[in-house]
Amino acid sequence: MNIVTFCQIDESLFNPEFKVEYFHTTGEATDADIVIIDIDSIFEFEENKTKVCKEKFVSIAIIDDESDYEAFKNFGIDAWIRSADISQINNIINLVNKRLLS
């Protein structure tokens, strides 16, 4: 599964079977099944999603508080995770894979 992040996340948090690429490393990430964004990267994601993502993809937003959720809900984000719970990122990836990508 290809995951592209638009924000800095410790790659050691991800299961080894996931191919994780940070968008800013090359600026040329493609074929994302899942994209991970935060409040600071939402507009960059919107500008680049057609060239970065597969036709069918899932977006996961990392939120810090309720105001982040309010900002994201108008962008059609598929799933959310609190930044305090980021160590559980694999659980949400597996969940969205089963429910939205299968």
What is the predicted role of each segment?
Residues 56-60:
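Proline-centered loop/turn at the N-terminus of a beta-strand
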Residues 1-25:
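Short, charged N-terminal beta->alpha structural module
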Residues 10-15, 42-46, 67-71:
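Short, charged/polar "capping" segments at the starts of alpha-helices
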Residues 18, 55, 74-77:
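Short, structured coil segments at secondary-structure junctions
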Residues 94-102:
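The C-terminal output helix
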Residues 4-10, 36-42, 62-65, 83-85:
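Structural motif
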Residues 66, 73-94:
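Output/docking surface of receiver
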Residues 30-55, 65-66:
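Conserved phosphotransfer microenvironments
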